[in-house]
Amino acid sequence: MLSLLPTAVQAQDKPLYTVVDGYKVDADTMTGFRTWRAAACDRCHGANQEGMVGPSLISSLKAMSKDEFVKTVRDGRLDKGMQSFGTSKQVMDNIDSLYAYLKGRSDGAITRSKVEPIR
């Protein structure tokens, strides 16, 4: 069954992410997943973004704005053990894609943490 779910929309009316069958995603969202993996965010937030030492991003992104997300990733929360990624070129160059991937997980549109490109 093919189901296309562009659920979150940015201000320009361009979908924040596009998901098919719960795990096939557009190229930008795929870049976000690859950035997640490269930055090893799963060490603290868990392989399924459900939290470990760090909080669940599935829950956090339900209430956190994109601006708050960017600030947290860029500056870290050193008092809580969250490192800063502000000097990571890969993370900062792909922050919008990373947000799209994690927001899709939080919204429930992306139903598993490991995604594949839409073909």
Task: Place the predicted regions along the sequence by residue.
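Short cysteine clusters
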Residues: 41-44
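N-terminal signal peptide c-region/cleavage motif recognized by signal peptidases
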Residues: 6-8
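Bacterial N-terminal signal peptides
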Residues: 1-4
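Gly/Gly-Pro-rich "capping" loops immediately C-terminal to redox-active cysteine motifs
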Residues: 23, 27-34, 46-87
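Flexible coil segments in periplasmic/lumen-exposed cytochrome c-class electron-transfer proteins
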Residues: 12-30, 38-39, 80-119
